[in-house]
Amino acid sequence: MEEEFFENEQVKKFEEMIENNEEYYFSSEELEDIIVHYLELGDIAFAELAVNYALRLHPNSIEIKTKRLEILLEQQKYTQVKELMVELRNSSMETMDFLVCCAKYYSNLGNPRRAIEYCEKALKYGEEQNFLHNFIA
């Protein structure tokens, strides 16, 4: 409950910043939570605003770049997805979020075998096994 309140406060602060055309500092973790909030709502436009701002503040954050990957997948910008996957591959092959993004990419392009390979790798690292089993099915 306290974490949800904190997250909502950060989202309010971010929206206030956008509305007032100001710039506030957020940690990379706070921005990641804000991006996740918008992704869960399906508000890709605000998720993209948040990820672009996050990358300006934290340009080397692997987690933020992975969130950018999720947004690009939602926007079906597959050329950019592939480029970012190549950039992140060496540093992210053991993170579930990255592996799930790779699985979605190959699934969306009609390559289910490759998608399943990435899902199987993700099963080794993630707690979301039900999601992954459903994704494979």
Where are these regions (language model features)?
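Residue at a conserved register position within TPR or TPR-like alpha-solenoid repeats
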Residues: 37-38, 72, 106
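Structural register within alpha-helical repeat arrays
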Residues: 33-34, 68, 102, 136
